[in-house]
UniProtKB/Swiss-Prot annotation:
GO terms for cellular component: plasma membrane. The keyword Methyltransferase does not apply. This is UPF0114 protein in repA1-repA2 intergenic region. Its main location: membrane. PANTHER family: UPF0114 PROTEIN YQHA. Keywords: Cell membrane, Membrane, Plasmid, Transmembrane, Transmembrane helix. It is a multi-pass membrane protein. It comes from Buchnera aphidicola subsp. Rhopalosiphum padi.
Length: 166
């Protein structure tokens, strides 16, 4: 009976598979990326420097979110479902198979901080059109992300130290 329960629990990890496949639909961001590029090309020479910086920040934001999607999909699949069998080691991403759950959390947290930083920079560039309390709220949210990322990294570092000592 115990073996059946253990096999069932172990097999249930495959219930996460649709979640990781579903994340790939987030790559619809690619369409947004190219849509922004296509719409900016005719106006690029007439655009102000700050307007161009805002567009570039938008593109960077999309790239960061896309990278976050790849990292979560690949590492989540490898950590919780099955190792990816990639025959050609040259095509295998260097970090694949090396990230444990804590390092994934730290990478996700730092990616969220980077994405939040881009949003905050974009907000500051349009500060004259935005209410002060909205800017303050965004800064507070960003600082919360930063403190959370530091906290998670600190906890991870302390838990690794504890394992070395014991």
């Amino acid at each position: 009976m115990e073996k059946i329960i253990e096999k069932s629990i172990y097999a249930s990890r495959w219930l996460m598979f649709p979640v990781y496949v579903g994340l790939s639909f987030g790559f619809i961001l690619t369409l947004k990326f190219f849509q922004q590029i296509i719409f900016i090309i005719p106006d690029i020479l007439a655009m102000s420097e700050s307007g161009l910086v805002l567009v570039v920040l938008s593109l960077i934001d999309i790239a960061l979110v896309g990278g976050l999607l790849v990292m979560v999909m690949f590492s989540g699949y490898e950590n919780f479902i099955s190792k990816m069998d990639i025959q050609d080691n040259e095509k295998r991403l260097g970090w694949m198979g090396t990230m444990d759950v804590n390092s994934i959390k730290n990478k996700v947290a730092s990616s969220i901080v980077a994405i939040s930083s881009v949003h905050l920079l974009r907000l500051f560039m349009e500060a004259e059109r935005i209410l002060d309390n909205k800017i303050m709220l965004c800064v507070i949210i960003h600082l919360t992300f930063v403190l959370s990322a530091f906290g998670m990294a600190y906890i991870d570092k302390m838990s690794k130290k504890k394992h070395i000592i014991h």
